[in-house]
Amino acid sequence: MTVTKIEIPTIDLRGYYEPTSPTSKEEVVAQVRAACLEHGFFQIEGHGVSLEVQRNMLAACKTFFDLPTDQKAELSLYKNTWRRGYEGYGEQTPHHAVLPDQKEAFFVGRDLPEDQIGFLKGPNVWPEQVPTNQFRGPVEEYFEALLKLGHRVMEVLVVGMGHPPSILDSFTGNAAMFLKLLRYPEHTFTDPRVFGSGAHTDYGGLTILLQDPGKHGLEVYHAATEQWIPVPAVEDRFVINLGDMVQRWTDGEYKSNLHRVLNKASGERFAVPAFWHGDLEATNPLNPNDTSGETVQDFIRKKFYRDYSLPLAEEKGTAVAV
């Protein structure tokens, strides 16, 4: 039986933001909408994030993960309640997975003072032994660039749903976003159930993924043909996918799709997903007829605890991780 070859589309955003682009704004909007309807995934070029900022971010990943294990463990995210810091190998098992993920991670969010600690809110933690220009500086610069990119991508999404960009005013004013720096070891495991990241959906708004160029591994499930579609790791190209919140808030029109990672490269593989959720206090901007009053925080909080079998605890009293 012949298997239909499916690819995740690549879209040049310059057609939307640059008047001199040969692609029209309407074409870009239509391409993004089609990808959201079929895959819940698309790749973007012409995004406005400099190649230098991307390369510095990946170099910062290597700098951190090359630290001795005991130094990384000192920054464990289990030592705080707002999900910042280091997560070691095997410490996460996605809801749909059988075995723990074979990866290590480091989480960064908006850097807030301790008197503002709350659900997913608080200060970042940093490795003091690493010079600022080798880690914290590049990470913070990348964070700011991705905050802006998330806003731009969301604008294209809502225009594709027939809404004016202004509908996002309250949603993007103080958008919550989290970086998850990742290192996957070389895949030498013989158990076919072991993955760098097991099959899962993301449960927030947008995910914007930076991949280590040439280090392939991401696969997206295509239900209609029951196949896993490889998404290549190409320099200066981001992978965008929609989370469960977008699927819910569009009444299932836009997809939050299963995906997984199996490191197919020789040697280690780095990746940096940015989870861009919008303002935690904002309600649904994607469906003006939604009268539920559910906020971004309401949705994420429920998924956060349910998917990881954690009790509904007070954030200031119990350390939790996602």
Curated annotation (Swiss-Prot):
It holds the Pfam family DIOX_N. Its cofactor is Fe(2+). Binds 1 Fe(2+) ion per subunit. Pathway: Secondary metabolite biosynthesis. The keyword Nucleotidyltransferase does not apply. Keywords: Dioxygenase, Iron, Metal-binding, Oxidoreductase. Fe cation binds at residues 200, 202, 259. PROSITE patterns: FE2OG_OXY. It is an enzyme of class 1 (oxidoreductase). It comes from the Eukaryota. Its EC number is 1.14.-.-. One of its GO terms (biological process) is small molecule biosynthetic process. Residues 172-279 form the Fe2OG dioxygenase domain. The keyword Oxidoreductase applies. 2-oxoglutarate binds at residue 269. InterPro entries: DIOX_N (IPR026992), IPNS-like_FE2OG_OXY (IPR044861), IPNS-like_sf (IPR027443), Iron_ascorbate_oxido_reductase (IPR050231), Oxoglu/Fe-dep_dioxygenase_dom (IPR005123). GO terms for molecular function: metal ion binding; oxidoreductase activity. 2-oxoglutarate-dependent dioxygenase; part of the gene cluster that produces the acyltetronic acid derivatives carlosic acid, agglomerin F and carlosic acid methyl ether. Belongs to the iron/ascorbate-dependent oxidoreductase family. PANTHER family: 2-OXOGLUTARATE (2OG) AND FE(II)-DEPENDENT OXYGENASE SUPERFAMILY PROTEIN-RELATED. This is 2-oxoglutarate-dependent dioxygenase caaD. It comes from Aspergillus niger (strain ATCC MYA-4892 / CBS 513.88 / FGSC A1513). The gene is caaD.
